[in-house]
Amino acid sequence: MTVDRQALGFGYGEHAAYASNPWASRGRLYPEASSPTRSDFQRDRDRIVHTTAFRRLKHKTQVFIAADGDHYRTRLTHTIEVAQIARALARALKLDEDLAEGVALVHDFGHTPFGHTGEDALHEVLEPYGGFDHNAQSLRIVTKLERRYAEFDGLNLTWESLEGLVKHNGPLMTADGQGLRGPVPQPILDYCALHDLELASFASLEAQVAAIADDIAYNTHDIDDGLRAGYLTFEMLEEIPFLARLMREVHDRYPGLESSRFTHEIMRRQITAMVEDVIAVAQKRLGEVRPESAKDVRCAGRVMATFSDEMSETDRQIKNLLMTRIYRHPEVMRVRQGAASIVTDLYRAFMDDPSLMKEHYWIDQIAGMAEPARARHVGDYLAGMTDTFAISVHRRLFDHTPDLR
């Protein structure tokens, strides 16, 4: 019996001409039969959600390492918020929502324990062997390190999902093969030798909305978490004209509103304003370029989903506020220093004695490896750790573990 795809709610008739077509995917590295009940992009999204890497995001830091209280964001809650915004943008622009959501859900898979602090520490110890890049690590996870399926390593995602993962922040190299932001990480080059992700072009519009959704989400929720932690005040927010205007709107409409509700009303207005700004810019640029296919978007030579000049300035001001008031706060810096030492200590311990990893797969795999491969293997193990697991292992192996609270 033939399944009516539109009757299943895939809604391809609602897609714009420039949207990625789930029925015309460029395929998977290992060919698979299509599902009669789900599009290829739906299957990608579902595979991503069922991974151990996705579950581990629950115990990985967003900003506040080992924070007291259950209301601060983690990588998982951040990822879910990004996916919601990406899906809303995709619907407004008549894109494939499943592809946009999938890219949003997978974009942080490669993050280490302790956020960017852990990544910096791991990059430093791995620098002699090519360093560490969380985006390249995300690709390694979904193409190699997740071991779930009988016929292949990784998730065997479609070309479009992998392209979106690797290029959601823009092209990685020039047409003549030069890296645009430094050397292209070797894991990305290695995969492209098997399955060319066309690193010199832009990604699909679905991937672009996932990228800008990431900016919108963390700009908003880092303010929320900063207020909750006491690192930010409403007076500090008033220094930014955009936020000052939102605060006046809320105050005028709801005078005397309690602090938590006041904060929420500001945040929801901030998200709405930023989303509407991106939609307006994307519609304008699409009207100028008039792409007739997803390929036309990739070859347009510029990003389609981005902020206006005015909102870009607001974005810059918010990032500067977050950097000076939160990310470089003395207490945050103290905790970051301790977190970095945990990652460095564990790396050295595992390199000296791999049996300390205590997991047979990782120990067995490292036997006989040359030092560069051994270092990358230990890096993979460390990158997969959650904050809580890294702390507990450090306590088992060392007499003193830094207090991260």
Curated annotation (Swiss-Prot):
Q: What PROSITE patterns does the record point to?
A: HD (PS51831)
Q: Does the keyword Cell membrane apply?
A: no
Among InterPro entries, the record links this protein to: dGTPase, Diverse_Catalytic_Enzymes, dNTPase_2, HD/PDEase_dom, HD_domain, PHydrolase_assoc_dom
Enumerate the spans annotated as HD domain. Answer: 75-219
Query: Which UniProt keywords are given for this protein, alphabetically ordered?
Result: Hydrolase
Q: Name one GO molecular function term.
A: triphosphoric monoester hydrolase activity
Q: Which domain of life is it from?
A: Bacteria
What protein family does this chain belong to?
A: Belongs to the dGTPase family. Type 2 subfamily.
Concerning HAMAP family, the annotation shows:
dGTPase_type2
Question: What is this protein's record name?
Answer: Deoxyguanosinetriphosphate triphosphohydrolase-like protein
Q: Which organism is it from?
A: Rhizobium meliloti (strain 1021) (Ensifer meliloti)
